[in-house]
């Protein structure tokens, strides 16, 4: 964040959307173990994965301001800190043999599971000067041009099997670019929705109708809901995953994110959670992996679906309560800003 804007007022709707996003992240990951055994759980999981990271990436773009000092002393530091925590967890708890996966250095530098997002943000933030130039100097035309270029890069990148876990860096980049480029228009949409009920209600109804219909279709499907490439978008194009699939994924993610700005921008109960996403995002995955490794997920596999749903909710909510607590967040806020101190705004 630029130093002069470090004291800028928060936009509540962004915290609200981040709160929704982190809920979906945690519930999505905690139900993944059961998604292939139940159409209800599988359809819910796929629905979450259509848009939850698009929403998160857009929110990151909405609050992004370029600062090389912050990029190094906070964002790079957070990534390395998170990777160190994950590395210790993998070595001590999972007793992983790093020699079989590229060695200890590769395990530390390359993102483990959910850490891809912090990894991607480092690359995305380097493009901020170009994105903000297009937005601020060329206005709406520049924003449209920037989004078109980011989509073109994402679609082209799918033709290459990228090393160093770069596939998602390219695949999800348009969502981040959209948040940066269309920040004025998205802010305007939030203000309009707060003044005119129709701007809030109509997108909500359209989202419910569209997602409800697609959910119903998945519930009627006779086979197994297991198209992993289309769900995760973490591989190059190949059999069962094409450029058209990625284009649809990008379109659905952007349109859904816009609709959620209008529909849920005033749902303030989610805002407190949205202000505490760091600890939840970093630590929920090792907690989940630990529970799976201990066998906590096995007893429910043969149970009726309502029991499985209740079990997932219990575990996910317990994780959220712990990681959303004041002591945990106080520690993580201190760690996040250990090297980065915002400069005071000069008059």
Task: Pin down the residues of each PLM region.
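Alpha-helical transmembrane segments and their immediate juxtamembrane cytosolic regions
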Residues: 1-347
């Amino acid at each position: 964040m630029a130093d002069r804007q470090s004291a800028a007022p928060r936009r509540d709707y962004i915290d609200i959307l981040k709160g929704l996003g982190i809920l979906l992240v945690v519930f999505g990951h905690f139900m993944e173990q059961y998604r292939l055994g139940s159409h209800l759980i599988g359809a819910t999981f796929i629905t979450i994965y259509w848009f939850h990271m698009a929403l998160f990436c857009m929110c990151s773009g909405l609050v992004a301001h370029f600062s090389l000092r912050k990029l190094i002393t906070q964002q790079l530091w957070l990534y390395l800190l998170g990777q160190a925590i994950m590395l210790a967890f993998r070595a001590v708890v999972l007793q992983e043999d790093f020699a079989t996966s590229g060695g200890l250095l590769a395990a530390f530098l390359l993102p483990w599971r959910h850490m891809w997002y912090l990894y991607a943000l480092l690359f995305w933030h380097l493009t901020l000067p170009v994105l903000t130039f297009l937005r601020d100097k060329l206005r709406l035309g520049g924003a449209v041009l920037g989004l078109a270029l980011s989509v073109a890069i994402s679609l082209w990148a799918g033709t290459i099997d990228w090393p160093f876990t770069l596939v998602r860096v390219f695949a999800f980049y348009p969502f981040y670019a959209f948040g940066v480029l269309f920040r004025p228009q998205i802010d305007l949409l939030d203000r309009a929705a707060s003044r005119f009920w129709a701007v809030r209600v109509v997108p909500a109804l359209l989202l419910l109708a569209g997602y409800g219909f697609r959910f119903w279709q998945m519930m009627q499907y006779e086979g197994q809901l297991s198209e992993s490439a289309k769900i995760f978008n973490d591989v190059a194009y190949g059999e069962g995953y094409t450029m058209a699939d990625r284009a649809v994924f990008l379109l659905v993610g952007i349109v859904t994110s816009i609709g959620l700005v209008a529909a849920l921008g005033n749902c303030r109960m989610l805002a407190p959670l949205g202000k505490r996403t760091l600890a939840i995002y970093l630590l929920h995955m090792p907690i989940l992996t630990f529970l799976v490794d201990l066998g906590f997920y096995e007893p429910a596999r043969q149970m009726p679906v309502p029991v499985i749903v209740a079990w997932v909710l219990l575990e996910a909510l317990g994780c959220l309560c712990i990681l959303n607590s004041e002591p945990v967040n106080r520690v993580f806020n201190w760690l996040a800003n250990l090297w980065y101190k915002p400069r005071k705004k000069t008059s």
